[in-house]
Amino acid sequence: MNDYCINKYYINNYHIKKAFNKRALMQDLIKKAGQVKLLVMDVDGILSNGQIIYDANGIETKAFSVQDGVGVKSLARYGILTAIITGRSSPMVDKRAAEMGVNHIVQGRDDKLIALNELLATLDPALNITAADCAYMGDDLPDIKAMQTVGFAATVPNAHAEVIKRSHMVTTRAGGTGAVREICDLILKGHGHYQDFIASYTLDEAKTQDNLSWILVF
């Protein structure tokens, strides 16, 4: 009985510490996200699932997440810039970027770090955006140098192991399935805009609580 109590205590203590550490880590990530002025995204493996599909005519197609699009637009709503830096070139990327309202698009660049530095050099100096003010989402080796330079580096669970090792955060969702949205939400939280953004899509919950309670009881 005593052994059981001791073991139970240690098990509970372990879970408490684990929960505390997880919360502390999340608070640190939110703090980092709160410094972000520009979100830079790779395309293949981040905005898409990394697969390249060719039709019978050899035309390349990609699939993108609608939820990611909402996330990118949410950043623009609060004055946070977005950019795409990708090694491949595709008219579909231009089209999707335009739909999402991405501010800067750089395609066909293998050296992502040079591309990032060149992009930063073109920004209005009044914005005062440096690499330390950027978040970068990448998933493979060409992204690492740029990710090591920025203030907040994020990747996806199926990224290359070397990328994961050098990332501040690994999203729950894979590329092309809402991973970018996770980072966008985190950036909104860091800047204190998340609740305001959610409130713009919801009714006054105090007025709808009675109906919700009735549904749950029923």
Identify the residue ranges that each predicted region occupies:
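Non-catalytic pre-domain segments flanking phosphatase-related domains
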Residues: 1-41, 193, 197-218
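Alpha-helical substrate-recognition element adjacent to the catalytic core
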Residues: 20-114
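Mg2+-dependent phosphoryl-transfer enzymes with acidic/Ser/Thr/Gly-rich catalytic loops
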Residues: 58-62, 98-100, 104-109, 113-218
